[in-house]
């Protein structure tokens, strides 16, 4: 068991106050503190103190003895810690994104390598051959968009802006997946006068429309007034997660985080196809090829946890990670898994034991538990989040 020393990513959309208010993390230079990373991602691995008292990279520690630390099955299947665990603090909307599935990621990665596109090139889509499933768990009220609305709902929301673009009128005449695909691509392709006119019609509709999703469009327009992604809340479900609610983000499904603080767990991948609310490169043909144009009702988007005593287990449809919450009390309980785990203290305090070793976690602190250290004993007050594997 080792306490993690984690890095903060200072992306421009991050909150300058959330990590300080929630977890007392100092921010003397008033930087945006967008994401706290827990894991062994090559871009920014957590660090731990070794037996000699030196601070070393968790990635290097794992690399030196994968089977023991990750567990035999995970080491064989993934060859590394297969997940990245984050605290995400959004003060501004993030870009609308789509993550390709595993098969397309492998093909796209090989194709871009063969074409000699540098890894850091703006037009590079595939940074690795992996998929990027994600789970988001709200710590504060959390606003997001996820998946296409039911087509009948899109039709009624598009009525006030029917004249903004011919592709909108086409979809209204025949609301099916093919027309939605054309509409999605057409809105992203808009340039110059065509784009100005469409956005003017949308903004004029804002004057007469109340409630959602118009309120979300107003919020986004404060940050991206000239982005065609402003139409996206009319097409995608706007989801408000209450603290303690979670949502899984499937491959090939457009989504965006807009505002709030959440825990996020994902597979170790940087594969992102952008779809608006960004000044960055958008590869529209590649994006459209990787989107499933199917509706998903908003009431099916939340992940329903399964309660097992003091544990809440959130079912995850992939092997890359598992996620559960543990409510602590003075009564000792054990936490066990056949893999490595990262434990994060969400609130309160936790004491962990393994043999003669004892570790205390305060809110915002986290620990790495190697596979060969399972089970560990825990007690305290408040709540622990656990990310691990069920292989």
UniProtKB/Swiss-Prot annotation:
Keywords: Acetylation, Cytoplasm, Isomerase, Metal-binding, Zinc. It is found in: Cytoplasm. This is Mannose-6-phosphate isomerase. Its cofactor is Zn(2+). It comes from the Bacteria. It catalyses: D-mannose 6-phosphate = D-fructose 6-phosphate. SUPFAM superfamilies: RmlC-like cupins. Binds 1 zinc ion per subunit. It is an enzyme of class 5 (isomerase). GO terms for cellular component: cytosol. The keyword Phosphoprotein does not apply. The gene is manA. The lineage of its organism: Bacteria, Pseudomonadati, Pseudomonadota, Gammaproteobacteria, Enterobacterales. It comes from Escherichia coli (strain K12). NCBIfam families: manA, PRK15131.1.
